[in-house]
Each structure stands twice: as C-alpha cells, then as structure tokens.
Design a protein with these regions (language model features):
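Acidic, Ser/Pro/Thr-rich low-complexity regulatory regions
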Residues: 1-68
Length: 68
C-alpha cells in the first residue's frame, strides 16, 4: 500500500482503491489511513479532479468503514 498519494493519483478509482486497501490494514492504522483518504477526497474535490457525487460517495464509504 502506498503511504501517500501524489496529485496525479487523486482520481475516483485510485481514491477508492486507497480506501479499500486502508480497510485491510491492521486495526491501529486503519483509522489514520481512512482519515488520510478523507483528506485526499476533499483535496480532489476542491481541485475539481472528482465530481461532488463522487466525493460524497467516497466520503460515505469512509464513514461506513470507520463505523466497523
């Protein structure tokens, strides 16, 4: 798993993959990685690399996984 994403990685598919990989990490690092994913999602939306609907869907996935 990548420890960080670069600007050209901030797409819907790459962010979704980052979230999926974060969930499969150990329980101690998962919340930190999901927090990073939320930040990356916000940055991608602000930079108009993903749409509002995509950002909302990714944020919803993050919230669901954080509740696990």
């Amino acid at each position: 798993m990548k420890k960080y994403l670069e600007l050209n990685d901030l797409s819907y598919d790459v962010l979704g993959g980052f979230i999926e990989e974060a969930v499969h990490q150990d329980k101690r690092s998962m919340p930190f990685l999901l927090g990073k994913a939320a930040g990356y999602t916000d940055m991608a939306f602000v930079l108009e690399l993903i749409t509002r609907a995509e950002a909302e869907e990714l944020q919803l996935c993050i919230q669901i996984y954080q509740g696990m």
